[in-house]
Amino acid sequence: QIALARLLAGALSGTPADAAADLAVQCVPVADAVTDEAAKAFAGAEDCFTLGRGVTAAIAFECGLKLQETCYIKARAYHSSDFYHGPMAMIGKGTKVILFASGKALGGNAAPLREDSVKCANKMLELGADLYIVTDDAALFAGLPAKVLAVPGGKTEAETAQSLALAAQMLACKTSCLRGLNPDSPRALKKVTVTV
């Protein structure tokens, strides 16, 4: 939605679309293609974990929320660094895990985040998880027996986050449809909440 708004604003103002909007346009067909098999796998899932670190943690939380509200999957989202402190004990053979990982980082120093993403992926696999990695840097996970859902990356982690989020939303939407549900009309979603 944000990318479409940027494209529309650019068209109406006569100014070129920004890089993030262009990236989203490139990402749609790729994300559509790479999420097909994952959605089939998640269609039968009762629970899963979604993990990320840095900016990708927000995407992990959003993906978990979408899987909960549109697919009725008991999805639990964590920062990957926090996951090591207890929740990891819930991972066993066949536990579905989605790891969101970017090859970039805010501030430019991606090395620690990249290393942590690989460490997390290896640990999940060691514990027997059925691991799906949504990333703009498939080479980072080369050789791992995980399902890598590679999407185009941007020049920055913030731009790349948009591509990862698009893949997360497509995965939830497709999974919901495969479960015979309507992702546009979840049973308990309220558009307006009142907080006192």
Spans of model-derived segments:
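A SIS-like phosphosugar-recognition module
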Residues: Q1-V196
